[in-house]
Amino acid sequence: MEDAWEADALEAAEAAAAAAQAVAADAPTTTPSPRTLQRQRACEALMEGDAPDAAPDAPLRCAIAWDGVNCWPETPAGALAVQPCFDELNGIRYDIRQNATRMCYSNGTWRNYSDYVHCRELVEAESDEDAAMAFVFFVGFCLSLVAIAVAIWIFLYFKDLRCLRNTIHTNLMATYICNDATWIISAVVQEYVENGGLCSVLAVLMHYFYLTNFFWMFVEGLYLFLLVVATFTGEKVKLQIYIIIGWGIPGVIVVTWAIIKHLGKTAPDNAGESHPMVLLIKHCPWMAEDYFDWIHQAPVITVLAVNLVFLFSIMWVLITKLQSANTAETQQYRKATKALLVLFPLLGITYILMMQGPMDGVAGHVFRNAQALLLSLQGFTVALFYCFLNTEVQNTLRHRMSRWRETRTVGGGRRYTLSGHSKDWSPRSRTESIRCLQHRS
């Protein structure tokens, strides 16, 4: 009975310690930190001075031992050795208030591994600035969600607004909804729930929707480039091609990244601190940055670089056209500046401006807060410029309100539906997305 109990206890202890023992197993394959080497040298000095007791009636004991992570003291046979957790390992700080254990068998030998299951990484307290930035991101994403949801409803409800250009806008706005919503869900869930499986799913979804956002920005840039710069219209490129670019390619990239990251089993590095989009995510190794992340980071950088080329090309055509027009120079500059500012959020140029900046002092504080504000309100800005301030949208809404008031004045003699209407009054400028480009010949 006692043997059965001992076997069950041993099996349970081995199962509980299996995951934690990976720390000790990895130690020989990584370069030990100076603190770990210091502990090892101190332990080796103790082992050299630990002379074995040659007395025949001396009780069995386990000698001082170094397991690659911690130093275990001399322990009587059949006893469980208890040691405070190491304070540091491979540059990561651990909670020394918790304990690690190692069994000394009745024959005076150590168990092959130690139990570090209770040794947890110390989580630094969130600074006031980090909390403020997280709040800005949260509020900005919520505002963007509301604005984009209204904009998408307008584009889908009113048939007069259904065209390839607005369909592209709608898909871009949909990526903002998915991206912002996933970030909010991740922030809330990871704040209160520690679940490795859920963390992995949220990480993959966040990276996918983050990528789709940039690829639909690329689609916007490609469409405008074909419309304004190229010799043929962007309407000749079918919507299906844009959908494959915007939704399909990011899926292939993220699946590839997820498989390689899972197989690589890399350790967390900086806990994703450099990525503003995961500011609130905690205890989630999948959010940690490593060299595998270049699989999805390189396409983002490429998209932004290509969109920058698109922007220069479009602005060159616009400025050339304005210079040939009979308008005052001040008015030309005003129109060019307006077009440039409108294109910034659509093509993701804001991300380029916020990619690098000062990190220390007052300048760093201002930059980080500006980064949080601009990036979280990116979706709101797109909805504002390309829906709420769009001439075509305003005319559509104004026309519907006018018709609705007329029917109420008449007394509602016939039922009028907002979606049943004529399309002959609505402007159909191919370059309505940039109103100052309307008169391109």
UniProtKB/Swiss-Prot annotation:
Superkingdom assignment: Eukaryota
Extracellular side: 188-194, 261-291, 358-371
Localization annotation: Cell membrane
Topology versus the membrane: Multi-pass membrane protein
InterPro entries, A to Z: GPCR_2, GPCR_2-like_7TM, GPCR_2_diuretic_rcpt, GPCR_2_extracell_dom_sf, GPCR_2_extracellular_dom, GPCR_2_secretin-like, GPCR_2_secretin-like_CS
Tissue expression: Expressed in Malpighian tubules.
Pfam families the UniProt entry points to: 7tm_2, HRM
Protein name: Diuretic hormone receptor
Species, as recorded: Acheta domesticus (House cricket)
Taxon lineage: Eukaryota, Metazoa, Ecdysozoa, Arthropoda, Hexapoda
